[in-house]
Amino acid sequence: MARRPLVMGNWKLNGSKAFTKELIEGLKAELHDVTGCDVAIAPPVMYLGTAEAALSGCGCSCGGKSVIQLGAQNVDINVKGAFTGDISSEMLKDFGAKYIIIGHSERRTYHKESDEFVAKKFGALKEAGLVPVLCIGESEAENEAGKTEEVCARQIDAVINALGVEAFNGAVIAYEPIWAIGTGKSATPAQAQAVHAFIRGHIAAKSQAVAEQVIIQYGGSVNDANAAELFTQPDIDGALVGGASLKAPAFAVIVKAAAAAKN
């Protein structure tokens, strides 16, 4: 089946109110006529309100609803209560966020988030009607040891074991080899395709229907120079973009490359 690609910008710990407004204005100008590709941005959570306001009333052919959708970089497993500093799925929903990144290697590393904890976040998002963007991927040492498939399977199975394979209906997986994140080193299109095909096949072993519809993005030093070649691969359904998403022209090139390659 034809899958609609998704290109999502992960701003990480970058930005300000002024930066958010300026970047979104640039993105609206660049992307107002893009079709055939879903687009989302995940600014820091305190700027979601600014972003929501900046995205509304763009005045183009979208009828006041921007082609760019909102996302977020994290979520807590709790809905409310005495959980200082945390953000719930319902709060994200209240700001119009749809695509929520979970399991990013930076969260797994710096905040010691386990596969099982990430699976709980996945479940919380599904229950709230939001779209989990599940990041998976291996370290450089694991890659060199030939453990890429083992690591990816383990991270996917944590969700399947907790929620069932059907939980991946309407969800997104982002394969991000840790050794490629922010390093300038990207997997080759063939390398990325091999892992994406494995991921889809691993899910297909449980459900072919779920595997055929799940969006599998590539992430890890995706930029305006390498995106088009990555998107020629049949199992790469878009990208989770870091640094290049902070510049409207570069991010627009990536989005347009996905739209052109998949339509």
Curated annotation (Swiss-Prot):
Pfam families to which the protein is assigned, alphabetical: TIM
Record-level GO cellular component terms: cytosol
Entry's EC annotation: 5.3.1.1
Active site positions, chain numbering: 104, 176
A biological process from GO: glycolytic process
Record: residues binding substrate: 10-12, 182, 221, 242-243
InterPro entries to which the protein is assigned, alphabetical: Aldolase_TIM, TIM_sf, TrioseP_Isoase_bac/euk, Triosephosphate_isomerase, Triosephosphate_isomerase_AS
SUPFAM superfamilies linked: Triosephosphate isomerase (TIM)
MF annotations from Gene Ontology: triose-phosphate isomerase activity
Main location, first listed in the record: cytoplasm
Stored HAMAP family: TIM_B (MF_00147_B)
Family designation: Belongs to the triosephosphate isomerase family.
Name of this protein: Triosephosphate isomerase
